[in-house]
Structure formats: C-alpha cells, structure tokens
C-alpha cells in the first residue's frame, strides 16, 4: 500500500507513524483525558482499513483527516485538539517555503504526481524539469498574489479548476488558429530574422515548423494550421521544376515537348511534396519548445477550403501524402515503426469525399485505414458544422472551437492588422482562446444533497465564482504589450501590431474566446436522478444543466462584449484531482464518487454498454450545447482488417455529429516485440501498471503505449485516475 507525500513523492504506507503521532498528542493532555493504548492502536487499525479499501494511494493530508475523524469519534476532544494544533503549526512552517519540497522532488524525479501529470511530457528530461520548476513558481505566485483567496480555495478543494496556473504568472493565452497564410505569403520574422515568402513547397513546410515551435513557446495550449495555407506553394515548385527540367534537358541536348517536361516536373513535385510532409511530421515531434515538450499541433485537412481545379487537386495530393506517412508512423529508438502523438490530424468529411462515387473518396478510404492503424485522423462533418456554426474551421489544438465570426459582421474590421484580411469573408485564422475555468458539476450535485432547488441555487453560486475566475484570466491579458511575443502579436501568427502596442482590442468583440469548462455531467445526473444521463429522465435534467451554462455565458457575453463559451473539458490529470476532492468532501458514493476519475464533459460513462452509432447520436445533442469545444469518441477493437466498418462510422459522423474520433490501441513491447494490446494490471501494492501480456514486461521505459487522452494521443503514461478510466473503457463496436 502506498501514500503520496506532500512533495509528490510516493512512499510505502507505514501505520506505525499514525500510532507515534497519536501517542505524542496523547502525552500532552492530563492523565484523565488520555486515550488508552488500545484506543490508540484501534485508531491506527481503523485508518489502515480505510486506506487499504481505497483503490488509490491517499495523500498525507487525507490520512491526517482520517486520523482526526477517528480521534473525534473517541470523544477525547483534548487529544484531538492537540493533534489538530500540531498539524496546523506544521502547515505554517511549510507555508514559509511553499515550493522548496516540490521543486527538489522534481529535480530528483521523486514526484509521483508530476510523473503522471501530463501524458506527453517526460519528467526525467532536463528541459521538462525546467518547465515544471517554473510552473511551481508560477502556481505559488498565482496562489499567493494573483487570485482572490476564495477562488484559490475553490480550486484547491476541487469545486472549480483554474486551468494552467503554472503559466498564469505570465501574460499568455491558451490556444490558437495560426494565420500561416499571412506569414508565408507576406513574410514573417522568427528570432529577429526576416523570413521572406518561400519559393518552394518544402521551404514553406520548413518555415511552418519553425513558426510552430516559436508559437508553442509563447502560449500554453494547442495550435492548429491548415494544409490549404501550404498548398499554393506546390504550384510554385511546379513552375520552378518546369523551367529547371527544360534547361537541364536542353543543356544535355535532349529535345522534349511540353507534355514530357510536364511529366518529369510532376514527378519532382510529388517528391517535393513527400519531403515537405516528412519535414512537418519529423520536425514537429523532434522540436523541443520552452514548455519542455513537442508542440501540441493539429493539422487541418479540408478540400473545400480551396477552389476547385488545380489547387484542390494539389491539396488532395498533400493530404494523401500526409495520411500515407502517418499510417507508416515513425521509428522508435529500436527502429520499430510506432504511432507518434503529433501532429494531430483532422479530416473534414464533405460531399466530395464521403460517397463511394465522389471524386475524393479514395482519400476517405485512406483516412479510414490510417485511423484503424494510428488513431488519427479525427473527423469533422462539413454538413453538421455548417448547420451549427455557419462556417467550417478547425478547433484550436484538441477541441477548443472559436465562436462564429461576429466582429466582421458587426464592422469591427481588421483589428489584428493582418495583411490577408478580407472584409467580405469571415476570419478564423489568427484568433485565439484566452483561457479556461472548469466547474465540477459532481460537486454541485453532492453539495445539494439531492435537493433540486438547492442544486440550482448552488449552480448559480458556482457559475458566478467561475465568472470571476474567468475575468481574472481576461484581466491578466489586458494591457499586454505586443513585445511580449513578437511571433504572435507583431509578425503575423495572430496579428501585426506595432511594437509597444497593447493587445486589448483583440480580447473583445468576439475576436478571441474565453471558456467555461464543465466536467462530470454523467456523475451529476447519476447522483440527482439515480440514473445515467442516457435515460429519458436523466437526459432531460442533463440538457437543462447544459442550457443553464449557455445562458450564463450568453449573459456575460452580452454585458461585457467578451465571447464566453461553454467548453467540454478534457480533464487529463484533473480527473484524478476532482475524484480525490469529492471523496474527501462527500465520501464514497456508489456510481458517483467511488472511482478515481470523473467523466469528461458530457460523455457516456466509459463502462456503460452502448453501440457506436447510438453513442454518437446521443452525444450529438450535448455537443451542440458545447459551442466552445467538445469531441465525441467511440472505442473500437483493432480495425485494420475491417476498414469498411470504420468507413461506416465515418459516414454516420458526417450525417449526425460535428466532431468525433475513433479510439483503438497502438502498442509495442521492446522486450519481446509484441505489438498487440499492452494491458493494465494491479501490482503488489494495488497500483495500476502496464504489463505486456506476452512476456510480463512492466518497465514503461521498454514499451510504447499510445492511447487517446482527451482528444490528443498520449504516449507518456497517465495518473492512477486516468489509468483506471482507460482500463474500464468498453468497446462500442
């Protein structure tokens, strides 16, 4: 049995320490007020039983809470008071040096919580440790100086989650859609070096990856680019090769007609496309940003984003190459082809590619094969997105969607001073998200004690708390100068503001968004209605709650001219934090708080049996009410030999839901070469670990495991809460 120390280190549980602590408190009171030795040992025994009955390692604070409860039960209040006083004094000492232990445990790789905090960061690497160290300082400053005390307390108690406090000390936003078109066509500056318009497709791809790395180092969330911004440079290369081929053959004394020159030039174009796409794939996963990780980058593949004709065919060529290279994968250190985490790919299902007789159906077949093998691409339905948002555009990274462009419609104009702005078109690239605060809906429900009137009252109070926390995020960005991140604010990724100019205008009028996240809709409904939200009564209640969240955002938006938007929070590591806080506040409630995770956003519970099509149809009603971003998924077995089934799901997505993905497994054991599913098992301490079913290997450094984690693919393992959630996922097909 393990415990988690305050520093984050994982240690073996030692009941004797409880006995020693209680004896110390016992000695400080008069003889007639003391516990008997039997009572002291009974306290240790009772606490040990509770700890062993939990399916996770408890923190020191949680164990001390249990000791306090047991002391109070004995009726020996003086002993309990001495124990509580001693604990309080120790807490004051620790607060004098709030970050020391955390940082030291990071450096020595002893911090178990940090090891599993981010499934795409390796905490043993120096650059990651530096980022985490800076993050600890930022969190400390945020906690002590930058946020109101009640918001800090609500965050620490798991009532809300103030996302990314490890970056809040700086004036940084969350995620964005990169205006790569402006940067490439009109030039940019990277690291104080002028970058002019590229003269080939491969050069454009190289510039794009350099820009991606710079952007990632100046924000903390994901970013997205679209291939349609790169594709004009395919024809630039084509024109160059036509001239080169003609010159080369003329110099060699070989006569060639125009048709033959075209054929040879086209062969060179295809090779250049292959090289350019390879640059994107390998640069993205090998570049290291100041965040200590590869950039969280999404590549958008949408044929209808360019006009019909040569340029659309060129875009199809680039998409085909992107899918082929992703299907192949990348080699790990052993030289084995594996699934990379990035870039995330999004493929738009549209009229020209979804039907078997459509012109680009071959790309859809290729996308299906790629998904079956490598978990990507994910899918956006052009038909549904046009109906719901009026335009088709990518999410910013994983799932955060911009609100439809209203600033152009309202005549606000080119406030970003972009060189490619068109007042007759809606603008999405060059826009961003200011940040996220998430409400824990399960806590709202449990706090109401099943009284519906109290539920709605508490929800109103918590929403106002979230509103104030979101305003803190917004106010932190107000007054930010463009000099803080020239690649973003001055050189085209977001804007082309002058040096020393404030970014304030970009925070209003719908140019950027700010997100009210939510989590635990399933558990909330389960507690209030004793039923899943897939039941008729449960669904009605859950939808009312979603409508309430949207009403709040719309009210704030109208009053402040800031685009608040409801967001289906992915909760990578926070799912574990929320579950621990719920267990501490409300105990173990069957089906509600008895797991080490809570369900992301509106999702059907991972253990609930439901077929893929019913799940997507059901969740589509909730996705509409998450305009700030959400994604649905279906869990499927190995589909490499059943691509037709994948295509049938894709076609269902096209007709029924805006944004969805398929989850499968992609693993490799470096000890025995096993490439089936690596399993999750309990070790001797009851901890969930990964094990090769073929050879029994449990060394995470000697296996490659890829699982979908909240929209992205995770490859660096997960905390105990998320690991339990992965283990409990049922197949939907």
Language-model features, listed with the residues they occupy:
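Charged, amphipathic alpha-helical regulatory modules used
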Residues: 1-110, 727-732
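Metallocofactor- and cofactor-centric catalytic cores in central/energy metabolism, strongly enriched
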Residues: 273-277, 281, 526-527, 722-728
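Contiguous, well-ordered alpha-helical segments that form the cores/surfaces of helical PPI scaffolds
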Residues: 514-527, 547, 708
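Conformational switch/transducer regions in large eukaryotic molecular machines and scaffolds
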Residues: 14, 681, 711-712
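Conserved catalytic cores of very large enzyme subunits
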Residues: 89-93, 99-510, 531, 535-698, ...
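Amphipathic, well-packed alpha-helical segments that form the structural scaffold of globular domains
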Residues: 23, 467, 471, 522-526
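Long insertion/accessory domains within large nucleic-acid-processing enzymes
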Residues: 694-733
């Amino acid at each position: 049995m393990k415990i988690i120390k305050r520093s984050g280190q994982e240690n073996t549980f030692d009941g004797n320490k409880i006995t020693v602590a209680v004896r110390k408190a016992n000695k400080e009171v008069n003889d007639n007020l003391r516990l008997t030795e039997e009572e002291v040992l009974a306290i240790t025994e009772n606490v040990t039983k509770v700890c062993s009955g939990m399916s996770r390692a408890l923190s020191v604070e949680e164990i001390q809470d249990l000791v306090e409860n047991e002391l109070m039960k004995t009726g020996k209040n003086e002993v309990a008071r001495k124990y509580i006083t001693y604990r309080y004094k120790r807490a004051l000492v620790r607060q004098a040096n709030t970050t020391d232990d955390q940082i030291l445990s990071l450096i020595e790789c002893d911090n178990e919580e940090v090891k599993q905090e981010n499934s795409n960061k390796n905490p043993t690497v120096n650059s990651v440790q530096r980022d985490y160290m800076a993050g600890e300082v930022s969190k400390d400053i945020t906690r002590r100086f930058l946020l109101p005390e009640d918001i800090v307390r609500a965050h620490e108690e798991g009532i809300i989650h103030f996302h990314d406090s490890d970056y809040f000390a700086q004036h940084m936003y969350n995620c964005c859609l990169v205006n790569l078109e402006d940067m490439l066509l009109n030039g940019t500056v990277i690291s104080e070096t002028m970058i002019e318009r590229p003269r080939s497709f491969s050069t454009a791809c190289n510039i794009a990856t350099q820009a991606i790395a710079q952007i990632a180092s100046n924000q903390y969330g994901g970013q997205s680019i679209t291939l349609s911004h790169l594709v004009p440079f395919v024809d630039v290369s084509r024109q160059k090769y036509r001239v080169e081929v003609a010159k080369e053959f003329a110099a060699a004394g070989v006569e060639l007609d125009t048709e033959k020159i075209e054929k040879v030039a086209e062969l060179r174009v295809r090779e250049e496309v292959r090289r350019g796409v390879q640059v994107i794939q390998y640069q993205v996963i090998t570049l290291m940003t100041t965040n200590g990780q590869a950039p969280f980058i999404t590549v958008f593949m949408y044929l209808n984003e360019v006009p019909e004709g040569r340029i659309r065919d060129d875009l199809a060529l680039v998409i085909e190459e992107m899918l082929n290279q992703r299907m192949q994968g990348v080699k790990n250190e052993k030289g084995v082809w594996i699934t990379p985490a990035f870039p995330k790919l999004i493929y738009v299902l549209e009229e020209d590619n979804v039907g078997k007789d459509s012109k680009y159906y071959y790309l859809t077949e290729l996308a299906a094969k790629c998904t079956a093998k490598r978990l990507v691409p994910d899918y956006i339905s052009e038909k549904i997105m046009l109906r719901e948002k009026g335009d088709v555009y990518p999410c910013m990274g994983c799932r955060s969607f911009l609100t439809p462009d209203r600033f152009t419609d309202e005549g606000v104009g080119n406030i970003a001073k972009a060189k490619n702005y068109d007042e007759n078109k809606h603008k999405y690239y060059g826009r961003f998200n200011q940040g996220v605060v998430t409400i824990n809906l399960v806590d709202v429900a449990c706090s109401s004690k099943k009284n519906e009137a109290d539920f709605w009252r508490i929800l109103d109070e918590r929403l106002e708390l979230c509103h104030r926390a979101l305003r803190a995020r917004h106010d932190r960005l107000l007054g930010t100068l463009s000099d803080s991140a020239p690649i973003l604010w001055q050189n085209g990724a977001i804007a082309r503001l002058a040096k020393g100019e404030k970014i304030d205008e970009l925070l209003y009028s719908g140019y950027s968004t700010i997100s009210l996240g939510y989590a635990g809709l399933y558990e909330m409904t389960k507690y209030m209605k004793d039923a899943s939200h897939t039941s008729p009564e449960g669904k009605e209640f859950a939808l009312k709650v979603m409508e309430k969240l949207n009403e709040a955002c719309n009210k704030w938006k109208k009053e402040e001219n800031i685009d608040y938007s409801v967001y289906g929070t992915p909760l990578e590591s926070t799912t574990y934090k929320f579950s621990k806080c719920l267990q501490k506040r409300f105990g173990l409630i069957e089906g509600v708080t008895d797991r080490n995770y809570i369900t992301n956003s509106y999702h059907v519970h991972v253990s609930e049996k439901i077929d893929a099509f019913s799940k997507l149809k059901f969740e589509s009603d909730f996705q509409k009410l998450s305009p700030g971003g959400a994604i649905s998924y279906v869990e499927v077995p190995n589909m490499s030999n059943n691509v037709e089934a994948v295509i049938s799901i894709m076609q269902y997505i096209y007709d029924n839901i805006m944004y969805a993905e398929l989850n499968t497994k992609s693993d490799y054991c470096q000890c025995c070469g096993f490439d089936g599913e690596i399993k999750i098992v309990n070790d001797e301490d009851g901890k969930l670990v990964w094990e090769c079913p073929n050879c029994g290997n449990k060394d995470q450094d000697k296996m490659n495991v890829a699982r979908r984690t909240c929209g992205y693919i995770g490859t660096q393992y997960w905390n105990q809460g998320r690991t339990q959630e992965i283990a409990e996922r049922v197949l939907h097909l």
